[in-house]
Amino acid sequence: MILFPAIDLKDGQCVRLKLGDMDQATIYNEDPAAQAKAFEDQGFEWLHVVDLNGAFAGESVNGTAVEAILKATKNPVQLGGGIRTLAHIENWLSRGLRRVILGTVAVRDPALVMEACKAFPGQVAVGIDAKGGKVAVEGWAEASRLGVIELAKKFEGAGVAAIIYTDIDRDGVLAGINWDSTLALAEAVSIPVIASGGLASMEDIRRLATPEMRKLEGAISGRALYDGRIDPAEALSVLRAAA
C-alpha cells in the first residue's frame, strides 16, 4: 500500500482546491520543489503531481515547476493535467517522469491510451475523476454520461499501470474516502486502483491497512497532510506493517 503525497500546481504554486473549484484554492507552499524534497525527507517513496492549469488548458502550463520538482526529489513522480497527446507523454517521460496520468483523453480518445501503453509500457496511468458517479473531464469542468466502471473496463488488458480514482465530491474537504465506490471499482477490474479524494485522518490510514483494502495499490493524500491531520511517520509505519 503506497501513500502518495500530492502536489497540485496552480500558477506555479503548491495549492489545494475544494471540490475541484479553481476559485477555492489554498496556497500551501510557493516553492513546489521544496515541498517535493520535504515529502521525500519525511519518508514518502512516490509523489503525485497535478498541473491544475494544464488540466483546463489541455497542455502543460506549470512545466517549469514540474521540472524543478523532478530535479529536487529522487522519488518517482507521476503527473496528470493537460497531457493529451503521445508527444506530451514522450516529452515528460524523457525528462525523468516515472508515470503520466491520462484523464480527459481517456474519455475522448481511448485508442490513444492503448497506443501509449504499447509505446511506454508500465508508465501510463488513467485518471478517472467522478462526480455523482459519472466521469468528469476538462479539469472536472464538464460531466460526461460515462460511468466509472464502464470507462475502466475499456482498458482491461491494455497495459494501464494504474487507475487513479478521484471522488470529486470529497476532494479537498476531508470528508473521508468513498470506500464503497473505490472498492467496487477495484473489484470490477484487474488494473491496480489508487484512491484519491477525501483522505482525512489516521482512522482512514488504519482502514487502508486492513485486509479488505489489499485490492488497492495505494491512496493519495493532500490537504490532510498539509493540515497536519495525518502524521507522515505514523501513517507510513501503519501501512508498511500491513504490507
UniProtKB/Swiss-Prot annotation:
| GO BP terms, alphabetized | L-histidine biosynthetic process; L-tryptophan biosynthetic process
Active-site residues are D8 (proton acceptor), D129 (proton donor)
Metal-binding as UniProt keyword? no
Q: Which domain of life is it from?
A: Bacteria
InterPro entries tied to this protein: Aldolase_TIM, His_biosynth, HisA_bact_arch, Isoase_HisA-like, Isoase_HisA-like_bact, RibuloseP-bd_barrel
Pathway listed for it is:
Amino-acid biosynthesis; L-histidine biosynthesis; L-histidine from 5-phospho-alpha-D-ribose 1-diphosphate: step 4/9
Catalyzes what? 1-(5-phospho-beta-D-ribosyl)-5-[(5-phospho-beta-D-ribosylamino)methylideneamino]imidazole-4-carboxamide = 5-[(5-phospho-1-deoxy-D-ribulos-1-ylimino)methylamino]-1-(5-phospho-beta-D-ribosyl)imidazole-4-carboxamide
Q: Which GO terms describe its cellular component?
A: cytoplasm
Annotated SUPFAM superfamilies? Ribulose-phoshate binding barrel
Enzyme Commission numbers on file:
5.3.1.16
| Compartments where found | Cytoplasm
Gene Ontology MF terms in the entry = 1-(5-phosphoribosyl)-5-[(5-phosphoribosylamino)methylideneamino]imidazole-4-carboxamide isomerase activity
| Positions of disulphide bridges | none
Keyword check for ATP-binding, yes or no.
Answer: no
Q: Which Pfam families does the UniProt record give?
A: His_biosynth (PF00977)
Key words, A-Z = Amino-acid biosynthesis, Cytoplasm, Histidine biosynthesis, Isomerase
**To which protein family does this belong?**
Belongs to the HisA/HisF family.
User: This chain belongs to which protein, by name?
Assistant: 1-(5-phosphoribosyl)-5-[(5-phosphoribosylamino)methylideneamino] imidazole-4-carboxamide isomerase
